[in-house]
């Protein structure tokens, strides 16, 4: 009887450990690669991973393209295209699907990045930041393209968005630099 009593806590500990491992693994993924042309890679915790369609994307990933292009869809439906010779870091991604709110922070280190707002920007726009070496962009539910040169100089182009019903609209972005805010 005493050996049975000792086994119950051991089994419970084992089951909880397996559940914790499953939860931590499922929480790590913030999106997927949805389209890929030529080679691109993700650097994750020092490991280099060649990307392909359905490669999971996680917080702290560095996405780097050479002659390739990678499209990413986050779990809140945010879409990001990383074009040729570009580098993008996923700094932070937190999303509550029930409330459709969260926080997104990206760093564009080099090249051209196209951003299309998902649910976080539509419902918690103040919590979406995209940084370059020389500027920071706050997103208010829209699409834009940014280009970062090797010297860090950055340019931004605001684009019209199309909602789920096909209606076109233009959101807004706030660009901040050391010289001020636009």
Language-model features: locations:
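Flexible, surface-exposed loop/linker segments and immediately adjacent secondary-structure boundaries
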Residues: 27-180
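Bacterial N-terminal signal peptides that target proteins for export
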Residues: 2-14
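Bacterial N-terminal signal peptides
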Residues: 13-22
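Serine/proline-rich low-complexity intrinsically disordered segments, especially terminal tails, linkers
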Residues: 4-5, 19, 26-28
């Amino acid at each position: 009887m005493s050996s049975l009593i000792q086994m119950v806590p051991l089994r419970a500990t084992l089951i909880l450990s397996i559940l914790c491992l499953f939860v931590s693994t499922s929480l790590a993924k913030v999106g997927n690669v949805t389209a890929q042309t030529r080679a691109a890679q993700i650097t994750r915790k020092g490991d280099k991973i060649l990307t392909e369609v359905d490669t999971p994307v996680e917080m702290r990933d560095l996405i780097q393209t050479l002659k390739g292009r990678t499209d990413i869809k986050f779990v809140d439906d945010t879409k990001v295209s990383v074009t040729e010779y570009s580098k993008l870091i996923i700094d932070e991604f937190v999303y509550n699907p029930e409330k459709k709110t969260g926080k997104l922070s990206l760093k564009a280190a080099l090249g051209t990045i196209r951003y299309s707002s998902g649910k976080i920007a539509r419902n918690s726009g103040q919590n979406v930041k995209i940084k370059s070496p020389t500027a920071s962009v706050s997103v208010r539910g829209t699409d834009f393209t940014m280009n970062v040169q090797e010297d860090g100089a950055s340019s931004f182009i605001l684009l019209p968005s199309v909602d789920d019903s096909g209606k076109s609209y233009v959101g807004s972005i706030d660009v901040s630099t050391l010289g001020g805010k636009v």
